[in-house]
Every structure is written in C-alpha cells, then in structure tokens.
Amino acid sequence: MNKVLSLVFVQFLFFGLTVSAQTISPIIVECGKKCRGEFSIINNGLTPLAVTVEARSFSLDTLGHAINRSLDPGVDLRLEEGSARISPRGTHTFAYQLKCSAPPCSIALLSSMVVGHTAEGILVRIQLAHTVYACEKQKDCRKQVRAAAGVAVN
C-alpha cells in the first residue's frame, strides 16, 4: 500500500510541476475615448518566458466572435513596452495609453508566447488577449459595442 501511495505522490509531483498555464489580468477593460491602462502576464511555469505584444483593432460578428484587423487610423495607442522576458513564476506588467478619435474603438492587445513544442518539433505558441473597449463614456461601453454588432446583450 505504501508503494502505491508513493507512486501516486511521485506522479502528482511530476504532473504538478510540468502542467502550468500562463495567465493575463485583467481580460477586459472599458474606458472613455482617452484612457491609460495596464495588464499583467503571469508566468506560472518553471522556465523563463519571452512575450511579445501586438495591438489589433477588431469588430464583432453577430455571434460575438472577434474579427481582428490592423489598428484603425483613428486609434493612437502607445505601449510602454512591446516585449518582455518573464522569469519563472514571475509577473510582468505592460502599460499603455489609448486615444480614440472616433469612438467606439475596440482594441485587442495580443500577448504571444512560445510555451513548448510538439514531438515533431513544431513550436506551440499561445496568444492571450487584453481587450479594451473605448467609448464616449466608460459606463456600459462593452454592452454598446456588442449591441451595435447585433450580439444579444445580457
């Protein structure tokens, strides 16, 4: 019985150390046509992580799925950093300033990172999105954008 428990403990320890996920916080932000904000990437892994941030404008289809495109001409976005190296179990905060000349503006800040590779050697890259909705007024901005796209608003 002790041998079985020891084996279970070793498996738990092994899988507990190898299974990890990167996280982003906050996921969604609503603001006025001018805003400052920041988001954090947390590396829950045991190896350093290189992260790059790409800004994209997006619109929503009637099902609420995002359709990404390059930044709209009326969007002035300034990222303090476009990339970073995050230490194991570390956190990095990216700050930005956004001005939207023709609200509403919907922006996705896509953080890309390579988290491993397949048995065939293909790199596995993930993207985590920090979404910014900018309207004339901050209150219910996301609901306004979703309603304008024809998405059912709760």
Residue map of PLM features:
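Intrinsically disordered, low-complexity Pro/Gly/Ser/Thr-rich segments with frequent PxxP/GP/PP motifs
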Residues: 69-102
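Short acidic, flexible loop segments centered on an aromatic residue
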Residues: 46-71, 112
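Short, solvent-exposed loop/turn segments enriched in Ser/Thr/Gly
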Residues: 32-38, 90-94, 104-110, 126
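Terminal connector regions
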Residues: 99-144
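Sec/Tat signal peptide C-region and signal peptidase I cleavage site
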Residues: 17-23
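Positively charged n-region of N-terminal signal peptides that target proteins for export
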Residues: 1-4
